[in-house]
UniProtKB/Swiss-Prot annotation:
Residues 73-83, 144-164, 238-269, 327-380 are cytoplasmic. GO terms for cellular component: plasma membrane. The keyword Glycoprotein applies. Disulfide bonds join C120-C203. Belongs to the G-protein coupled receptor 1 family. Receptor for QRFP-like peptide. The activity of this receptor is mediated by G proteins which activate a phosphatidyl-inositol-calcium second messenger system. One of its GO terms (molecular function) is G protein-coupled receptor activity. This is QRFP-like peptide receptor. The chain crosses the membrane at residues 52-72, 84-104, 123-143, 165-185, 217-237, 270-290, 306-326. It comes from Branchiostoma floridae (Florida lancelet). SUPFAM superfamilies: Family A G protein-coupled receptor-like. Glycans are attached at N5, N21. It holds the Pfam family 7tm_1.
Amino acid sequence: MMLGNMTFTQTILHELLRQHNMTKNEFIERFGLPPLVYVPELSPGAKTVTLVFYVIIFLAALLGNTLVVVVVWKNKVMRTTMNIFICSLAASDLLITIVCIPVTLMQNMLQNWIMGDFMCKLVPFIQTIAVASSILTLTGIAIERYYAIIHPLKVKYLLSKTRAGIILALVWVVSVGVATPMLFVHKAEEIHDFLYEQRFVTCQEKWWGQTQQTSYTIFNLVVLFIIPLLTMTSLYIRIAHRLWVQQPVGVTGNFAHGNSVRRKRQAVKMLVVVVLLFAVCWLPYHTVTVMNELTGLRLEEKSAKLLIAIVQLIAFSNSFNNPVVYAILNENFKKNFMTMLRCRVNRVSPQQVTPNTLQTPLEQSTRSCRLPAGAPNQQI
C-alpha cells in the first residue's frame, strides 16, 4: 500500500501507531483504511449457479466422453482412422473434466487456494495440454477428411491407422511442450495483510517479465487457435465444394454412389459442427485472456472475477458437446451409445429368468450388451 510516495510497510505501521498512540483498530477506523490485500469472491448467487452448471458439465462430459472411448475400443468396425482422432479428442475432454473442472470449481467457491503448489502448477499445465491437443486433433481430422474425399487414392497410404497413431503422438508431444512453461510460472503464494491480520493463499501466474507473458499468450492465440481455425475453414470449404457442387446426389443415377456421397456429407456436417462449437466455446476465453494481457480488463475486481468465471464455464462446456453431436448426427455412434446405456440399465436379474429360459442371466446380459457392429460402409 502507498502513502503518498511512501510504501506502507509493517514497520511504518508500528511507528504510526506509536506516534498517534492508537491501537490498530482505532487507526483503521480513524483513517478509513481498506484491507491491504483484497481477494475477490463471487456472490452467493453466482456461486450457486456456477456449482449447478459445473456439476452438469462434469457429469455429462464424463459419461459422454467415456462412452466414445469405450464404443471405439470395443467395436473393431468403429476403429477407423477418423475415430482414432475422435478418441484423442475425447481423451482431451476427459483431462479437462477430471482435473480442471473440479479444481476450477473449488477455486470459484473459495477465497483461498487449498490444493497446494503441485495442483497450482498441474491444473493450468493439463488445461493447456488439453486445449492444444484438441485444436491440433481437429486440424488432423480436417486433413484426414480432405484426403479421404479430395484424394481418396492417397489416403490409405498417407493416413493409415499406424500413421494416424504417429500423428497423434506428435500432437500430444507438441501439446506437452507448449504447456511446459505453466509448470514454472504458476506457484501457490501466501499473502499477509498485516493491517487486518489476514492471510490468503492464492495460485498466481508470475512470469519473468511482462514481455514473456504477453508473447506466450499471443503465441497460443495465433498458433493454437487462429491458424488452425483458418486451416480447417479452408479445407472444409474445399470438401464442401467437392461434395455439394461437383458431386450432386442423383445426377449419375448410381444408387451406391449417391449413398456414399450422402454419408460423407453427413460426416462433414458433424465435423464442422464440432469445430464451430470448439471455436464458439473457447473464443470468449481467448478474448478475455488477451484483453487482460494487452490492456487490462479495466473492471472492478469482483466484476473481473465473475467475467473470468463465466468464460471458463463456457470453455469447459465444450467438453460435453462432442458426444452429443456424435449421438445426434452419426447413426453408428448413436446405436452404440444406446446399447452401452441399455447394458448398464437393463441387465437381466435372476428373478426375470423363467424355467423355459435356456440361457443363464449372465449369458442373456452379455448378449443384450453386445455392441452393434455396423456395416463398414456406414463408418465415418
